Amino acid sequence: MANRGAALVTGGARRIGRVLAVVAAEAGFDVAIHVRTVDDEAEAAAGEVRAQGRKATILTCDLRKESASVALVGEAEAELGPVTLLVNSASVFEQDQFSDMNRASWDLHMETNLRAPLVLAQAFARRLPADREGLIVNVLDQRVLRPGADFFSYTLSKTALWDATRMLAQALAPRIRVNGIGPGPTLQSIHQDPADFAAEVATTLLKRPSAPEQMGAALRYLIDAEAVTGQMIAVDSGQHLS
């Protein structure tokens, strides 16, 4: 398969991000896997990318530090060549309610889930070669279609990123497409035990989890769907309608 350029996948060593990194490799991209710290999972993810016949590199960055986020696209380019696919998968998911929301929780979610993807998108657009087209995919959440009062700061950050996705689709057209993927109950979260996760799955229309591989299928579709921009695919077994 021809080299389609390089992909930068934030949070690319674990959970959904890892699947998306491998799918990018399957689609013909060399992959820069962003992590906060290098560990065995990061090395294993890089190995999976290389198993697809693509190059892989691991980059470290605390996305709450704007200067580090700004530099990340350039670091990926230095290792792998021009970055033509940006996948913003890294995310913070902490519980708070409006009654106990504080500045620390607000800043944690907004800096990681909203500000960092925007900073990365800006750097991506600035560095994209004039003769190339690009794609940005933001990992959102079905909650943006059905917001609730729990996980208050998290939901606000993802809802704002969904608005930004549509705004960026307009601002960066025609050379860069911008889309989102909205997971539902995909993997048991740190706030759930197996019974909690099963109960959440049972609330969906299809009564089954939206497996990480389904997120990968959505990414592969968006890579190839050259007439699609400003959209979110809710891969949530219909949870946003339940």
PLM feature segments, named:
Residues 13-15:
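Conserved glycine-rich cofactor-binding loop
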Residues 95, 135-173, 185:
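Catalytic loop of short-chain dehydrogenase/reductase
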Residues 211-235, 240:
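C-terminal substrate-recognition "lid" of short-chain dehydrogenase/reductases
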Residues 81, 173-177, 229-230:
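Short, small/polar-rich loop/turn modules that mediate ligand/substrate recognition or access, typified
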